[in-house]
């Protein structure tokens, strides 16, 4: 059975030759070179992913939603009752939540995964539960390092199993009351930013309670002393099971040489962890949308990412990842279905990259 260390070691590098061939092909399509902008660079990025066999393509699509509760909810950092996590997870199995509707529109399957819901098991939800909620990061660690490592490996294997069954495009999502607090703590640690710069309103926290949330994040970091150079240490000390789960999806997809669409702020924190654990993950990550959560810009700047969509969204669940899946498919369609300049006897002069 593969260990986490072996999985990380075996993440392949992008295929530079395939990317060069893709760029040459795109430059010869029936358009001025570069005129389809980031759709072109996305197609080249996809071409370099070994799991796609050297060409931009999309097979089956899946959004993996990691569901868990958080002990830090007890600190008054969320307005919704904790039971809403379980209620919404059940709603996801019925296809009625935001991510389910958007995923259905994109032709993607939603996998609802319980990695730490504080309730009885829910029919139709994949059970990878570590515990009924993680620890309160304001008073101690979220979980042990061994728990984090075991969950990373389990989710990575689940992701790779889906890849073997034909999934070639993954999206990540989460569900958990109070989870923007540990996400903000992680972003603060990884970027070196003060908590006040990255703490937002989450699911409509009243402005009068923001200062308390900032204080909770600062206390969590001060008490746990996470090492910013050790992604697993940060996840286990100030993260949460849902954040670990999303990180595991990224590691697993990268191991299989396949793309992962990020969602919003929560997924940015997990991406920071994934890239710290294994920098080789970075070329497989695709930013979907620019989260409206306060710390989004700082997290994205640290990841050197510019999302494709600016929709003022902050729902989470993987909604942004699902919404961006058609953009990935559009990049593939451009690559395979457009005509070629040579076939139409069109010769463009040099310097037409910005033509419209």
Curated annotation (Swiss-Prot):
Q: Which family does it belong to?
A: Belongs to the CobT family.
Subunit structure, interactors included: Homodimer.
The UniProt record lists the EC number as: 2.4.2.21
Gene from which this protein is expressed: cobT
Swiss-Prot/TrEMBL catalytic activity: 5,6-dimethylbenzimidazole + nicotinate beta-D-ribonucleotide = alpha-ribazole 5'-phosphate + nicotinate + H(+)
So where's the catalytic machinery, residue-wise? Answer: 317 (proton acceptor)
> Which lineage do the record's taxonomy fields give for this organism?
Bacteria, Pseudomonadati, Pseudomonadota, Gammaproteobacteria, Enterobacterales
Name by which UniProt lists this protein: Nicotinate-nucleotide--dimethylbenzimidazole phosphoribosyltransferase
Q: In which pathway does it act?
A: Nucleoside biosynthesis; alpha-ribazole biosynthesis; alpha-ribazole from 5,6-dimethylbenzimidazole: step 1/2
Q: Which GO terms describe its biological process?
A: cobalamin biosynthetic process
Entry superkingdom: Bacteria
């Amino acid at each position: 059975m593969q260990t986490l260390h072996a999985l990380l070691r075996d993440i392949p590098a992008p295929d530079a030759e395939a990317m060069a061939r893709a760029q040459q092909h795109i430059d010869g399509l029936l358009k001025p070179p570069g005129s389809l902008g980031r759709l072109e660079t996305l197609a080249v990025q996809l071409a370099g992913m070994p799991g796609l066999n050297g060409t931009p393509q999309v097979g089956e699509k899946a959004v993996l939603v990691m569901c868990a509760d958080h002990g830090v909810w007890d600190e008054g950092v969320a307005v919704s009752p904790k039971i809403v996590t379980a209620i919404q997870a059940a709603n996801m199995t019925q296809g009625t939540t935001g991510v389910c509707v958007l995923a259905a529109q994109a032709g993607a399957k939603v996998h609802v995964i319980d990695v730490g819901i504080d309730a009885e098991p829910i029919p139709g939800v994949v059970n990878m539960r570590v515990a009924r909620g993680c620890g309160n990061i304001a008073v101690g660690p979220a979980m042990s390092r061994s728990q984090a490592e075991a969950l990373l490996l389990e989710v990575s294997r689940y992701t790779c199993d889906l890849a073997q069954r034909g999934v070639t495009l993954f999206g990540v999502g989460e569900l958990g009351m109070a989870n923007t607090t540990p996400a903000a703590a992680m972003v603060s640690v990884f970027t070196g930013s003060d908590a006040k710069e990255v703490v937002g309103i989450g699911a409509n926290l009243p402005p009068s309670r923001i200062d308390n949330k900032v204080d909770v994040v600062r206390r969590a970091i001060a008490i746990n002393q996470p090492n910013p150079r050790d992604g697993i240490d940060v996840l286990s000390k100030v993260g949460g099971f849902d954040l670990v789960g999303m990180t595991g999806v990224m590691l697993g997809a990268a191991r299989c040489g396949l793309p992962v669409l990020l969602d919003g702020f929560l997924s940015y924190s997990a991406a920071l962890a994934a890239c710290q654990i294994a920098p080789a993950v970075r070329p497989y990550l695709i930013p979907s949308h620019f989260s409206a959560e306060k710390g989004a810009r700082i997290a994205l700047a640290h990841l050197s990412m510019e999302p494709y969509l600016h929709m003022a969204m902050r729902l989470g669940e993987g909604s942004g990842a699902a919404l961006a899946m058609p953009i990935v498919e559009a990049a593939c369609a451009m690559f395979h279905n457009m005509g070629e300049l040579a076939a139409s006897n069109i010769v463009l002069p040099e310097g037409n990259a910005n033509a419209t």
